[in-house]
């Protein structure tokens, strides 16, 4: 399984009054990993939507919280494609504190490819699938 991994610190804006990461901030980590995955395969978000003439709205977001993180923890966020559908793809994420084997959080996001003018589902562009295929869990 080929995963794409980023490193990110838990920042002041990520923590809540209890001094641990606010659960919603895991979505920030997921979004950074997703964006950097796309950039790494030549599909930077600053260009991909215009080039392919599509949008990729998220229609499902799920995550499980396993262990707390605190300010300045360095985390590793891994992402891979768990599924290509006809009009959608599912990205799976795992969050670990750097150097520790225990899972801190994991989850998935489903993106649907839609026509930019009608906002109706359309097949995933072949270029998108081909470029992300190395990160598909088989």
Where are each of the predicted segments found?
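HotDog/MaoC-like acyl-thioester-processing domains
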Residues: 2-6, 65, 69-74, 82-138
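Short glycine/proline-centered loop/turn elements that form peptide/ligand docking sites
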Residues: 43-45, 57-61, 65-66, 80-87
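Residue-level signal for functionally critical sites in structured catalytic/ligand-binding pockets
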Residues: 11-16, 23-27, 31-34, 61, ...
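Hot-dog-fold acyl-thioester-processing enzymes
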Residues: 1-58, 116-138
